[in-house]
């Protein structure tokens, strides 16, 4: 029987030494076990832990001890009570959170993984407490606001530029005269204004007419609230459903039933072959789109012929361009500069 008792004592010593080795100063409750600090077992639920914390917090709260008193109601000094209150609060913060409690229990059971315990402890303490979803939402809103105002800035720049182009300016002036808008600026008598005021009002009238009459396409088009990132994310399920419906209709109508393409479908195929976005394609003039349709570029073979012709034409233009001639001459005679590490 004696060897069996010796074995049990040895195992108990190893268990206690391992448990003590897991308690490191600076981690959680230091050299004390957080469960023992609160007087609860490792099987205690959140309710038991919260009740134990409230009792001990009332017992050791520093406000119960006056600065001049040597001993408080429970025979504690103000300093010792404050230390115990902090320890109780630390134990509660450790055990009330499920993830932190799992890490702490793992530390008690695996004291040999010293560096892992340090990593998990400080990674949780130093991790930001802000909800990631809030951070993402704020970031999306900030990007959306920046998008919207930058698009308005680009749109106003385009309007200001078009107001200086003679072609559009003359058209806007004619429309303003027909509507009698310019006559109002030339008032007489007491209501007469300076030339600067009249000119400023005329410019504003011209800009307003250009805004209303000219449909700007592409990157300088008038901003739409539903184009910003926030609404694109919100409406993504709708756009996805719309695309799937369109794709299924395309397959059924043209691949299965074999119907001919309409003008909209032909332009879509042409744009797809040209690898242009919708906004880029919209900036093309109508006569160019009509030319594409006349050349039947929605047919892949016709488009390949058109693309090769365009490449040949571009090469001819570059060959006859004086700037490209000078560049080729320079490349042939001198070439680009080179870095060398050779000693002079």
Curated annotation (Swiss-Prot):
Single biological process term from Gene Ontology: protein folding
GO cellular component, one term: endoplasmic reticulum membrane
Listed CDD domains: DnaJ
Membrane topology of the entry: Multi-pass membrane protein
Membrane-crossing residue ranges in chain numbering: 5-25, 134-154, 228-248
Any Pfam family: DnaJ
Protein name: DnaJ homolog subfamily C member 25
Main location: membrane
N-terminal signal peptide: none
PROSITE patterns linked to this entry: DNAJ_1, DNAJ_2
InterPro entries, per the entry: DnaJ_domain, DnaJ_domain_CS, DNAJC25-like, J_dom_sf
Family membership: Belongs to the DNAJC25 family.
Claim: Nucleus is one of the keywords in the record: no
Subcellular location: Membrane
Gene3D superfamilies reported in the protein's UniProt record: DnaJ domain
Keywords: Chaperone, Membrane, Transmembrane, Transmembrane helix
Domain J: 33-108
């Amino acid at each position: 029987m004696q060897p069996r008792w010796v074995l049990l004592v040895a195992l108990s010593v190893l268990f206690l030494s391992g448990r003590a080795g897991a308690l490191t100063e600076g981690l959680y409750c230091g050299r004390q076990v957080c469960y023992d600090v609160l007087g609860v077992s490792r099987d205690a639920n959140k309710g038991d832990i919260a009740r134990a914390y409230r009792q001990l917090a009332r017992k050791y709260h520093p406000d119960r001890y006056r600065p001049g008193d040597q001993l408080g109601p429970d025979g504690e000094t103000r300093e010792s009570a404050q230390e115990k209150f902090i320890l109780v609060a630390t134990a509660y913060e450790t055990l009330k959170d499920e993830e932190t409690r799992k890490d702490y229990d793992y530390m008690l059971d695996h004291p040999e993984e010293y560096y892992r315990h340090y990593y998990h402890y400080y990674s949780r303490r130093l991790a930001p407490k802000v909800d990631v979803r809030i951070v993402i939402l704020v970031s999306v809103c900030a990007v959306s606001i920046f998008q919207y105002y930058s698009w308005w800035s680009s749109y106003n720049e385009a309007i200001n530029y078009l107001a200086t182009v003679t072609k559009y300016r003359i058209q806007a002036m004619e429309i303003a005269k027909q509507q009698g808008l310019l006559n109002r600026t030339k008032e007489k008598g007491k209501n007469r204004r300076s030339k600067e005021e009249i000119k400023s009002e005329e410019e504003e009238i011209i800009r307003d007419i250009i805004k209303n009459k000219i449909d700007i396409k592409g990157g300088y088009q008038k901003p739409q609230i539903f184009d910003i990132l926030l609404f694109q994310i919100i409406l993504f399920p709708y756009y996805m459903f719309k695309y799937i419906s369109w794709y299924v209709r395309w397959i059924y109508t043209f691949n299965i039933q074999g119907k001919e393409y309409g003008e909209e479908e032909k332009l879509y195929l042409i744009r797809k072959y040209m690898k242009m976005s919708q906004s880029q394609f919209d900036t093309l003039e109508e006569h160019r789109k009509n030319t594409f349709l006349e050349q039947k570029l929605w047919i892949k073979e016709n488009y390949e012929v058109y693309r090769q012709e365009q490449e040949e034409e571009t090469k001819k233009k570059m060959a006859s361009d004086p700037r490209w001639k000078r560049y080729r001459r320079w490349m042939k005679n001198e070439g680009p500069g080179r870095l060398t590490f050779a000693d002079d």
